Amino acid sequence: MPGIRVLVVDDSVVIRKLVSDLLSADPDIEVVGTAVNGRAALQKVAQLRPDLVTMDIEMPEMDGIESVRAIRATGNKVPIIMFSTLTERGAVATLDALGAGASDYVPKPANVGSVGRSMEQVREALIPRIKSLVPRRGITPHPAGVTVAPTATVQLHAPATPPLGGHRLLVIGSSTGGPEALSALLHTLPPLSVPVAVVQHMPPLFTRQFAARLDRQLPYDVVEAEHNQPLRPGTVAIAPGDYHLEVTTDAAGLRTRLTQAPPENYCRPAVDVLFRSAVAAVGPAVLAAVLTGMGSDGCKGARLIVERGGSVLAQDQATSVVWGMPGAVATAGLAERVLPLLELGPEILRRLARQRPSLVPAGALS
């Protein structure tokens, strides 16, 4: 059976060799070529028609971001995974690449001198992403069971009775494809009458840059969450990389709690942790949305939300980069609605508006 055909793009001959050897060792993957910069990658993508491209960001002649833009400008939708350095500069460049149309990213090998451990870390991060982004040849990247038509909006279980007093909290979980999906969703929402807490699987530095970027773009506050921070209506708090984000409550209202408890679902922050804490804090008055992402993080938490009378929405398969997390929720019958990405915002507004008298009053954000 043919493998997933991958093109490796990097200006370092050492990295090209290491990544090619690592991928070729997997029986489901075939490295069909390499390229030394973004310009050469354009030619190789057209010639070789790979199933997926791995792309360095910093390269001579044409860097990875320019190459992604050029590939997308031709209408080619081949999945592209960026190699990113875990630095402030690398975080900014990676977000730029995702905005240009890259599908995902993995940390670049930081210490070629420690080849064994470094490449094992790359293998653990890269190969599952490749197999999730190229769903073919018997490889199943999302749960089997529920099949959603490409343009369908699906109701999978009876809607929960609206909580008395309305929803008090919106929680969102996302992973692969999540930065662009979350940005698109938030751009459809005005300042809300409830606080928003988000877990996006990202490393440290990346979440801070991501929150800052959204804060510049949106007409309300988006912050990287800090410990014991008030969660106020009309604001969005994003979990910092390597910390679980929990919601707590006291006499003054809702607050954040950050912990470095063990990872759940191999993730820290984990969506399940956020969802579980939301139920503990507000009971049935929680509204959750599960966006594109690899794996099933959020499914256990979604079940708790539903069992307590809260509501869960999921992004549909057609608009997800990877229908793992939302697919797990849909397959388990936990989502009240499975919707295209750009229909989630209006659905959230509809649910908040029917249970609350209004959105945030004028001046409430000052």
UniProtKB/Swiss-Prot annotation:
Keywords: Chemotaxis, Cytoplasm, Hydrolase, Phosphoprotein. Residues 163-355 form the CheB-type methylesterase domain. Its EC number is 3.1.1.61, 3.5.1.44. Phosphorylated by CheA. Phosphorylation of the N-terminal regulatory domain activates the methylesterase activity. Signal peptide: none annotated. GO terms for molecular function: phosphorelay response regulator activity; protein-glutamate methylesterase activity; protein-glutamine glutaminase activity. The modification 4-aspartylphosphate is found at residue 56. Its main location: cytoplasm. GO terms for cellular component: cytoplasm. It catalyses: [protein]-L-glutamate 5-O-methyl ester + H2O = L-glutamyl-[protein] + methanol + H(+); L-glutaminyl-[protein] + H2O = L-glutamyl-[protein] + NH4(+). The keyword tRNA processing does not apply. It is an enzyme of class 3 (hydrolase). The active site is at 175, 201, 297. InterPro entries: CheB-like, CheB_C, CheY-like_superfamily, Sig_transdc_resp-reg_Me-estase, Sig_transdc_resp-reg_receiver. It is found in: Cytoplasm. One of its GO terms (biological process) is chemotaxis. Residues 5-123 form the Response regulatory domain. Belongs to the CheB family. Involved in chemotaxis. Part of a chemotaxis signal transduction system that modulates chemotaxis in response to various stimuli. Catalyzes the demethylation of specific methylglutamate residues introduced into the chemoreceptors (methyl-accepting chemotaxis proteins or MCP) by CheR. Also mediates the irreversible deamidation of specific glutamine residues to glutamic acid. Contains a C-terminal catalytic domain, and an N-terminal region which modulates catalytic activity. NCBIfam families: PRK00742.1 (NF001965). This is Protein-glutamate methylesterase/protein-glutamine glutaminase.
